[in-house]
């Protein structure tokens, strides 16, 4: 009977060691998966940064010529605004006088299409 209990004890210890080994193997597997995932994320991030850098370079090359066009348009706009402001200052008083004359000087007249029936 003692040999049977000793055999059972050995089986229990063997089962315990096997469970520990399985547990360690699972932990190692999880660590490897986690490490692989982190490496993949780092590689993805590096690739994304590289592609973004290439895109920015192409975008800058494409927009470089457009930037000079926008400064030219801005310059022309400023010149035209200056001319319009000059015209405004020159003609403001005359336009106001004409407007006030039309509004204030009312001459009552009979419309040419009005017929007097009589």
Curated annotation (Swiss-Prot):
A GO molecular-function descriptor: ATPase binding
Gene3D superfamilies the record matches: 1.20.5.2950
Tissues where the protein occurs: Kidney; localizes to early distal nephron, encompassing thick ascending limbs and distal convoluted tubules (at protein level). Ubiquitous.
Keyword Kinase: no
UniProt modified residues of type N-acetylalanine: 2
UniProt keyword Cell membrane, yes or no: yes
Localization per record: Apical cell membrane
One BP term from GO: synaptic vesicle lumen acidification
Keywords annotated in UniProt: Acetylation, Cell membrane, Hydrogen ion transport, Ion transport, Membrane, Transport
GO annotation, cellular component aspect: apical plasma membrane; cytosol; extracellular exosome; extrinsic component of synaptic vesicle membrane; lysosomal membrane; plasma membrane; synaptic vesicle membrane; vacuolar proton-transporting V-type ATPase, V1 domain
Domain of life assignment: Eukaryota
Function of the protein: Subunit of the V1 complex of vacuolar(H+)-ATPase (V-ATPase), a multisubunit enzyme composed of a peripheral complex (V1) that hydrolyzes ATP and a membrane integral complex (V0) that translocates protons. V-ATPase is responsible for acidifying and maintaining the pH of intracellular compartments and in some cell types, is targeted to the plasma membrane, where it is responsible for acidifying the extracellular environment.
Record family assignment: Belongs to the V-ATPase G subunit family.
Assembly mode: V-ATPase is a heteromultimeric enzyme made up of two complexes: the ATP-hydrolytic V1 complex and the proton translocation V0 complex. The V1 complex consists of three catalytic AB heterodimers that form a heterohexamer, three peripheral stalks each consisting of EG heterodimers, one central rotor including subunits D and F, and the regulatory subunits C and H. The proton translocation complex V0 consists of the proton transport subunit a, a ring of proteolipid subunits c9c'', rotary subunit d, subunits e and f, and the accessory subunits ATP6AP1/Ac45 and ATP6AP2/PRR.
Name of the protein in question: V-type proton ATPase subunit G 1
């Amino acid at each position: 009977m003692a040999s049977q209990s000793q055999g059972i004890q050995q089986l229990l210890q063997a089962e315990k060691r096997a469970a520990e080994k399985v547990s360690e193997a699972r932990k190692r597997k999880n660590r490897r998966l986690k490490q692989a995932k982190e490496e993949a994320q780092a590689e993805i991030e590096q690739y994304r940064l590289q592609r973004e850098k290439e895109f920015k370079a192409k975008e800058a090359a494409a927009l470089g010529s457009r930037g000079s066009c926008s400064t030219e348009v801005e310059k022309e706009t400023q010149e035209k605004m200056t001319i319009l402001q000059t015209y405004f200052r020159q003609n403001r008083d005359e336009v106001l006088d004409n407007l006030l004359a039309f509004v204030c000087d009312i001459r009552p007249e009979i419309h040419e299409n009005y017929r007097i029936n009589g």
